[in-house]
C-alpha cells in the first residue's frame, strides 16, 4: 500500500524541517546519481539549505557541467560537436535521397513505366490508385463544366 499524499507547504517546526530537508536531499541526490548511471547523462545538482549551506552533486566535474551549461545558454545550437552534427546531416541527406528515389519510382509507375518489378498485388494496387485518380479528375472536370454552364446561363439571362 502506498503512502498518503501530504500537503506541500512550509514546515513550521525547525527541527522537523531540517530532518525533512536532510531526507529529501539525500533522496534527490540518489535520483540524480541513478539518472547519471542509467541514462549515461551528465548531471549537476546544486542545493542551498535555508542556512545557506551548499550541497552539490556532479556525475563528472561540476566546473565542466557549468561551463557546458553557460555555452549552451549563450548559443543553444552549439550543443553538438562538429562530427555529431556532420553525421546528423549525412543521415538526413541519405534519408532525403531515399525519399526522392521512392517518389521517382512511384511517379514512373503512375506513368506506366518500370512495371516489370511489380507483382500482381502491386499492379492491382496501382490500378486502384489510377482508377481513383481518374475518378477524381472526371469529378473535377464535371464541376468545372457545370460552373462554366452556370456562368454562361447567367450571362445569357443578363443580356
Swiss-Prot record:
Tissue specificity annotation: Expressed in seedling roots and developing seeds.
Residues covered by the MADS-box domain: 1-61
GO biological process, one term: positive regulation of transcription by RNA polymerase II
CC terms in the record's Gene Ontology section: nucleus
Localization per Swiss-Prot or TrEMBL: Nucleus
Classification via PROSITE patterns: K_BOX (PS51297), MADS_BOX_1 (PS00350), MADS_BOX_2 (PS50066)
Keyword ATP-binding (UniProt): no
GO molecular function, one term: RNA polymerase II cis-regulatory region sequence-specific DNA binding
Nucleus as UniProt keyword: yes
Domain K-box: 86-159
UniProt keyword annotations, A-Z: DNA-binding, Nucleus, Transcription, Transcription regulation
CDD domains for the chain: MADS_MEF2_like (cd00265)
Annotated function: Probable transcription factor.
Name listed for the protein in its UniProt record: MADS-box transcription factor 23
